[in-house]
Amino acid sequence: MVYTPALVLGHGIPIVSEEDNIVELMRKFLCQITSSDNKYVRRGSIESSEFIKEINSSLDSETAPDCEERILHQDMTRQIVRCLSEAKESSLRCRILLLPRTLTANVALDVVRSSAGEPCGLRGAFIQVYLETQLGQQLQMLGTITPDPTVTPTFELSVVFKLDKDCWPLLKHIFVTDKVLKLRPQYRLVKKKLYSSASPVIHEFC
């Protein structure tokens, strides 16, 4: 008598192919790696309520010189988070985006402070957000931020996030829909005044 796999395994027990077993093991291994990295925020959606609480907590720890800068800082942080969240679903096409816990708050504070001395302040900024996947290669556009659409921009600001290339290279491209991307703590700001012929000013932050 020849038994089918269903009879060998018994009634009510699902049949799992060898490929399914391998995929499941890889998924579990990937989850263990991501959960062990406690220096990074791991979210399926970086706009979850828990993530917003972490942002607010990091903002509370900042010592802003005045109330106005604090309000601008909070608003800019949320706009950067929104930009990254939208890019996660569109241009990045990843399910999980890992980033250092204070990265967005740090970037937002530097963006606000870069507007000091500008004719319209932060309201005159046109902000472009990029991702640097590899040094020397073309930057990937993630989105744009316009603090006040009613104001004609007086300066352009490029925010360049950097991809962590050590983000499990053997695993991150196995699952197209489950791709995991991780950002480094370092970033770059490039400021160009639109009313001046001066060369852009580049700041690297570690």
From Swiss-Prot:
It is found in: Cytoplasm. InterPro entries: RTP801-like (IPR012918), RTP801-like_C_sf (IPR038281). This is DNA damage-inducible transcript 4-like protein. Induction: Induced by LPS and zymosan in macrophages. The keyword Cytoplasm applies. Gene3D superfamilies: RTP801-like. PANTHER family: DNA-DAMAGE-INDUCIBLE TRANSCRIPT 4 PROTEIN DDIT4, REGULATED IN DEVELOPMENT AND DNA DAMAGE RESPONSE 2. Belongs to the DDIT4 family. It holds the Pfam family RTP801_C. It comes from Oncorhynchus mykiss. Keywords: Cytoplasm. GO terms for cellular component: cytoplasm. One of its GO terms (biological process) is negative regulation of signal transduction. Inhibits cell growth by regulating the TOR signaling pathway upstream of the tsc1-tsc2 complex and downstream of akt1.
